[in-house]
Amino acid sequence: MSTFLYRTNKIEAIFDYAAIARDFTILLVEPKETDDGSDKDFSFYQNPILDVLIQDAHALASVYMQGRCMAIFPKADSKLSAVLAKFSRRYTEYHIKVLDEASLLSPFVRHRLFGYANRLLLQLLLASVCNYQTQELQYHNVLGQIYLPMEIKEDKAGYKNCVCLHVSVTAGMYLSLSVTSFRQIDPANIPKGPLYLIEKDSMRRYLGSRSRIPKEEQAILFCQKSSRFTHNTIPFLDISSRAALHETKVGRFMEFMDMASRRLAPYLTISFVEQPFIRIGDKMKNPPVLEPASWNFVDLIQSPLSVLTSKLFLEYLQNQYPEYKITPCSEVNPEVPTLLLFHNRRYYRHDKQGKLVEDVSLPYRANLRTQGITLEALCDIFRLKTKKPTMPDKDLRKKQKMWDGTLRPLLAKLQSELRIKEDIQNRRFTVFHPQDYLSEPWTYVLPQKETRQDSANPKKKKTFFHFYELIMDPNTEAIAFRYFNEASEGLSRLEAKMVEDTKAFYDYGKHGLGIRLNYNETLDGFICPGKDPAMSYMIIRTNSFLLPDYTDMPMADLKYEIPAKELFDAFEQEIAQSSDAIYQAELSGWMEQIAAKQMEQGLTDLSLQLIKDAFKQTKAVVLPSAKTGAEATPEEKSKPRRMNGTIGTQLNQFIGRVTNGHYLFTPKGEKDLQKYLMDAHLLGHACRLSRPVFYKEQLEEMRDGIGYVAGSNTSNSRYTIPRAMIIRVILPSERNQVISDEMFKTYFSQLTVHYVKTGYYTVLPFPFKYLREYARYYNACQNIEVEAEDEEDEENVMDDE
């Protein structure tokens, strides 16, 4: 057995956003909303604006993906402003925006525009170094697609075909290599009409522009395609004499990556992710000096036969390869690879009629075989009978060659780390590795429906939707929060479509729905904290996690104190910087109330309770020109003042900023979300948990020692499964308690699974990465001020100003 590091095709890119913003201008082109509000798919192919960006505006590169186009220009281009102004007048159906430095430095803007790990930005920069307008013959770029010419061949008709290596950045920051070819058309037969430049035998990719073919360029390679649009070509000059024609794909690719790394060095650092590879077989004559390697071995079966087989298997490995430490583990170390031992058996489920049928929707068992070893395979290797186990021969060394030949293809699978990745189309789960959990940013939209009277027909009721949008970027562990409803103006096409999809789902399924926008999949992840730590639990699904923005949740510790001078200085500075007269008057009135209370009590440090009481005693500032409405009722007058409206939000954000995150009031729309979270109502709303499903005994069999979450499936007309607390998470409730790694280990050991009744459940992974964030949020929730019972009906929706 030998180990070495091999370079994968996964890219790790570290960007210098300030340098990019300093030297480049990035242009964003998006289609405008249609006047009739229709949600038809918009295509850029009907308009040559992408070609104009390259031909007329001289963009270094442009990339098109998911309904938007981006182009990159050198900052020193003085004519760019005039060209963009002309484009805006000519192409009125597009939004043409220049990304400023603040947008480029914002992680949320980058996530929305460039995707996970800024994939599109990497593709844009890579494409910019091989602009096909130059005389460089080595690399060519069309709309972000990178082609490395390798060889020119002639077909039977005498036409040349240029074989190219196509480089693209795929999801997950993997560099994908494929081979495609372009065919030359006889220049004498070039029609006056427009041309498509396409891959041979394929129409998958748009590669065009609007220029005519210069007659002097006899070696241009392109394919003719009847089209009413105008497109360009790639000038592949005659490269048949190049010595690099017969180079390998990898060599050609690495040549390009080395060049790109040098030219982009001031703006980003590109590196390949390396992984360890273990080769099982004869020992090397001169094995490299390696550090001790460790592996997790998890017995998912936990039967007497599996214990016996595991012991024999591990003894064999220890005898043959003493330099490696492979031991059974009760706690999986997420830093090292894991090998699973599981059953190779069939699984069953209930159909709609309640009959027990084989579940053929679990092809992930085949995937397990690529990541682990079945008990049946080990029994066959060691000649153990599955019905009546017997010990193999004592002399294991005599069977070394036979075992080596059998184990080599099995243990070679250790080169891959265990990951859980859900195949969305097949609805399947594979093996889980904590490090890979939540590796991509996602946008989560939680709808909440409200029944209203139909104004057109008072006898009927209609459903109205409120939405809470959360955007999380695991790379920065930052969360954005936004509230809107179906009547909100300025919704994007994607959000408008999401509203319609949500309505359709409610009409069809009668259940709550979470929509993960960037994958168009159902997202079923809910966090359910109870009234005390022992009652807290999570229902979570692969690659999903619902966590409110804890910086915007009401986290105020009312006993927290701030020096009076520091607070008053902050008030005066905020008043001086603001240009809003009402906001300034609100701040002045609030500061006067605080100063009066300070003088009355003779304090040097002011508590948040005092600051909050002072605000409740101030009167709202109203413009003299404001229309006077109906007089407030006595009940309304008796309610304590809250931070409502736009001004209230500014005041709340101001005091939260001054007190380092201690917000006094709940911002707009979040109180309902808070209520649902604390009362665990989200689970009660029949969240749709996906297949695969398992029975209790099968859950016992699949328990892997890490701790997982299982949630009850939704009810149907025949089977009704009550809401069940499947797992509980023990978290600290003491304030300011530091969560250490030792405490994490304690939590893992305390994870217990409770089976309420025999039924089928959905197996879900435990969110290791965000346990710390959940603990912080849970502790913050303990400090929330509980309103009096007679104030529970108080309206919490802020008035728009």
Name each model-derived stretch.
Residues 1-241, 248-256, 260-269, 274-275, ...:
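Long, contiguous domain-sized segments
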